């Protein structure tokens, strides 16, 4: 199972995922979402719309971490990624679990 943690505090965003989903389709779905978000935020940073504080990936451990700040467009990208992960959690609860920081409850 992949355990994700989502936190938003104003214009600061954190998404971390740990562990393997145990299902190839679920893993591919999550990978697409988190890498799309990371790519968007990286591009936003080059255009001075975001700043990445931490970015880590470890395929062997199934680890992803992205901590950043940004404008309303990066916020929309973050929220879209979280919605995608929530959809997967509803459809395949044995593959992913999401915990939320206080600002997200």
Question: Can you describe what each PLM-predicted range is?
Answer:
Residues 1-25, 34-105:
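N-terminal intrinsically disordered, cationic/polar leader segments
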